């Protein structure tokens, strides 16, 4: 006989709420609307309310651009922490944390495949990995992509999505500005097209190097493009900047960008430009840039 079980009523088990994923709902930076992430995927992370372009993860960016399957190129290994840098935490610890969070080795991926049936190589940066900052690994990636383009006689496309140079690598990071500039110039000297795609943001050392050297500059609607940010400029010159300053549309009006497109228009626009620059016919009559729906 157990008096606890016989005379004391068992307590009702406390129910615990189910855990909700952190990224289930996203707030639109443009209009403040709460957006269901599952619905956002259908629009390639463009707000259906105001049309604001939220940042797109690297793998989704590559999926958006290529016709179907694409092959990622293996990038040369670089020394992880040549300066033994430490601020509030070790640089090596930061790298480990971002690799775990993004699943990527660094802020760049280089892939080859077809866009509208035209073979090309794409080097894309990822803001989710340390703000897409350009260090030695990113520099190596751009150089690798350029060398691959020259070797296989195909166009080079870069997709900038970066806050600039990586401060944890100091002068070694700034050196990549010269290296990437030389790399894309090599592509041009070989008579091959180089298309620079700019997304939000394209700033700092990336905008001051390869990102602004394309034969054609294509920017996503509303993206920030510049060297220093508008807030820094206003604090320095102590003047209010013009409305829309450093946005894609402003740069197009002032001759720094050739084409401004929405995300859904990006691939069809690239196909048209590639077909003109390579003198190739587009293999597909219509290029779809919407995510494929799962077949039932």
Q: How should each PLM-predicted stretch be described?
A:
Residues 1-195, 201, 213, 244-296:
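Terminal-region recognition feature
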């Amino acid at each position: 006989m157990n008096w606890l079980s016989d005379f004391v009523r068992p307590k009702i088990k406390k129910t615990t709420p189910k855990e909700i994923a952190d990224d289930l709902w996203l707030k639109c930076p443009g209009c403040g609307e709460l957006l269901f992430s599952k619905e956002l995927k259908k629009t390639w992370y463009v707000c259906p309310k105001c049309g604001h372009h939220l940042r797109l993860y690297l793998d989704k960016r590559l999926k958006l651009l290529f016709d179907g399957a694409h092959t990622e190129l293996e990038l040369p290994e670089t020394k992880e922490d040549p300066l033994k840098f430490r601020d509030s935490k070790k640089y090596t610890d930061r790298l480990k944390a971002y690799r775990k969070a993004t699943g990527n080795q660094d802020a760049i991926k280089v892939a080859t495949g077809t866009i509208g049936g035209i073979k090309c190589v794409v080097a894309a940066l990822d803001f989710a990995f340390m703000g897409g900052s350009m260090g030695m690994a990113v520099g190596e990636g751009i150089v690798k992509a350029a060398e691959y383009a020259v070797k296989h006689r195909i166009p080079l496309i870069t997709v900038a999505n970066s806050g600039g140079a990586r401060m944890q690598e100091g002068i070694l990071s700034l050196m990549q500005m010269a290296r990437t500039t030389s790399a894309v110039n090599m592509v041009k000297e070989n008579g091959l097209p180089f298309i620079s795609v700019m997304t939000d943001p394209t700033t700092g050392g990336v905008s001051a190097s390869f990102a602004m050297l394309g034969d054609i500059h294509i920017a996503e609607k509303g993206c920030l493009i510049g060297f220093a940010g508008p807030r820094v400029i206003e604090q320095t010159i102590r003047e209010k900047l013009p409305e829309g300053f450093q946005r894609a549309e402003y740069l197009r009006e002032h001759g720094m960008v050739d084409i401004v497109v929405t995300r859904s228009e990006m691939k069809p626009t690239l196909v048209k430009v590639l077909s003109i620059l390579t003198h190739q016919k587009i293999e597909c009559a219509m290029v779809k840039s919407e995510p494929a729906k799962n077949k039932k």
